[in-house]
Amino acid sequence: MKLHTLLKLGVLSVLLVGGPALTSVHAAAADDETTEIGEQMDRMNRAFRELRKLAADAGSNAASLELVATMRAASAEAAKHTPALAADLPEAKRAAFTAAYREQMDKFIGVLDELAAAFKAGDNTAAAELVGRLRDVQRQSHREYKKPD
């Protein structure tokens, strides 16, 4: 019984003392793996989360337009880079993969432009529908072009 209790205390001590260190090592490794596309996608995701909350509110159109502009700039920057998943593909398929990725980003940017026009026109019903389309394009793109975590 004493040995069992001592083992529990030993394991608990290691977890309490070593756990934070292990977490910081993992976080540092994750930071090293951050790509330019990943940084831009993070910017887009933060803006998109906020935009989904505001899209239907006509009183928030100015803020919504700023969020769309942030997403558009991040999308345009991300489109300039090659997804990390391309490195896992055979050389013969990389160019087509990258071209398809850029085409999908252009499609996303096109929907963002439509969304900006809807906000400028005060058409929040259309804006809410376009936010749904953006979500669909985002999900499809992530399935096809994002490297699994």
Question: Would you name each region that the model predicts?
Answer:
Residues 1-10:
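Bacterial Sec-dependent N-terminal signal peptides
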Residues 16-26:
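C-terminal segment of classical bacterial N-terminal signal peptides
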Residues 26-67, 148-149:
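Immediate post-signal-peptide N-terminus of mature secreted/exported proteins
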Residues 39, 43-46, 50, 66, ...:
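Charged, amphipathic alpha-helical oligomerization/scaffolding segments
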Residues 52-89:
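Alpha-helical segments in soluble extracytoplasmic regions
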Residues 62-69, 95, 99, 128-133:
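Short, charged, amphipathic alpha-helical segments
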Residues 84-120:
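Long, amphipathic, charge-rich alpha-helical segments that form helical bundles/coiled-coils
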Residues 111-149:
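C-terminal amphipathic alpha-helix
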